[in-house]
Amino acid sequence: YPIDKSVADGTTVPIYYEGRLIPLHLLNNYIDLDFDQLVAEHPIETKDTLRRKWATIEHAVGSDSRLQKVAYDVVYHFINRRLEGKAMLVTMSRRIAAAMYQIIKQMKDAPEVAVVVSGNKDYLGQIQEELDNKELEKRFKNPADPLKLVIVCDMWLTGFDVPHLNTMYLDKPLKGHTLMQAIARVNRRYKDKEGGLVVD
C-alpha cells in the first residue's frame, strides 16, 4: 500500500525529512593498523574493496567524540522542536545504543530516555538493570508518561505502533523495505498530529 495513497485517504499522516550531518573524522593511521590485521589472510585483490568498507564500520560511527556530537544534536533538536510527542533514535549497534544512552542521560536538559535492545547482561553492563523492555513499551505507548525518547538498533522498528511517536532520528544506514518499515513508525494518525519527522 503506497505511502502517498495512505496519506491521501487519511489513513496516515505525511512524513517529512530533515537532513543533518555529523561528520566522521577518521585517523587513517589507526584505520590502516586495524585494517592490516583484519585482512592479513585475504588475497591482495580484495584489500582495496575491504578498505573502502572498513572506513564506514561501526567503530568509526561509534567514536566517543562523534557520539557526543550526535547526542547533543538530538537533544537540542528534540527540546527545540515545535512538535509534541515522543521520539526514537536508531543506532547502528547495541554498543552505540548503550553509549548514547549514557551520554544523553547525563545531559542537563535531556528528555527522559531509555534504551531498548536485545542482548545479554554482560554485554549491556550497568544499563541492563534499568531495562525491562515490556515495561518500557508500556511507558512509551502512554502519551502522558515522561519517557519521551527511546534509543534502539533493531527492536521496535517494525510492527511497533505508537501513534504519538512523531520524530525518528536515524543514525544508522537503512535501505529498502527496512527503511520503509522504520520510517512508517512516525506516520500514524494521532489527534491533531500533522505529520511525522525523520531526521537523518
Locations of regions flagged by a protein language model:
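Short secondary-structure boundary/capping segments
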Residues: 31-33, 103-108, 127-130, 165-168, ...
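Short glycine-/polar-rich loops that comprise or flank the Walker A/P-loop
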Residues: 1, 9-15, 84-85, 109-112, ...
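Conserved C-terminal RecA-like helicase domain
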Residues: 51-152
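Interdomain helical connector at the RecA1-RecA2 junction of SF1/SF2 helicase-like NTPases
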Residues: 1-84, 101
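Conserved segment of the helicase C-terminal RecA-like domain
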Residues: 146, 179, 183-200
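SF2 helicase motor core recognition
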Residues: 151-165, 184-189
